[in-house]
Amino acid sequence: MTSFTIPGLSDKKASDVADLLQKQLSTYNDLHLTLKHVHWNVVGPNFIGVHEMIDPQVELVRGYADEVAERIATLGKSPKGTPGAIIKDRTWDDYSVERDTVQAHLAALDLVYNGVIEDTRKSIEKLEDLDLVSQDLLIAHAGELEKFQWFVRAHLESAGGQLTHEGQSTEKGAADKARRKSA
């Protein structure tokens, strides 16, 4: 740990910001691994479109993890990018859908994005009074995460605006319902 932080930011605020950003770093590391898992395990009609749609998002999220880790270091703290850090910071269950259809994976992935975006927005609110530069970083990330969720949802939405997995609160439940609706 260093004995400095950013000029104009107290050590206490820097520590609070770094703690928030550490959780975000773990979220991004978990998300890019989950996206690769989906990329490798999606099957069925529309496979190639979804398979190829996911890789750019993986790279984007990996980039977000790097930006957040570098911001933590800039604050004079040590970013933790280990599997143990992901598990320690995790407030969600491990992604549970294995080899499955496009619809099943996308429905489960939509719920993953719900959690990531909700947590990111909470961090954005908390950063309002702590560090506007870090807040700005997460605001930019949130916009892109929301756009990608829209890409996912476009595959799941009916002409009437209903999602195939509406009402489901678990990835498995969402995947099961989407699979049944697409059969």
Swiss-Prot record:
Enzyme class: oxidoreductase
Keyword Nucleus: no
Enzyme Commission number(s): 1.16.-.-
Keyword check for DNA damage: no
Binding positions (Fe cation 2): 70
InterPro entries in the cross-refs: DPS_DNA-bd, DPS_DNA-bd_CS, Ferritin-like, Ferritin-like_SF, Ferritin_DPS_dom
One BP annotation, GO: intracellular iron ion homeostasis
Subcellular location: Cytoplasm, Nucleoid
Region (Disordered): 162-183
Chemical reaction(s) catalysed: 2 Fe(2+) + H2O2 + 2 H(+) = 2 Fe(3+) + 2 H2O
Domain of life: Bacteria
GO molecular function: DNA binding; ferric iron binding; oxidoreductase activity, acting on metal ions
Family per record: Belongs to the Dps family.
PANTHER family per record: DNA PROTECTION DURING STARVATION PROTEIN, GENERAL STRESS PROTEIN 20U
Protein name per its UniProtKB record: DNA protection during starvation protein
Native source organism of the sequence: Mycolicibacterium smegmatis (Mycobacterium smegmatis)
High-level lineage: Bacteria, Bacillati, Actinomycetota, Actinomycetes, Mycobacteriales
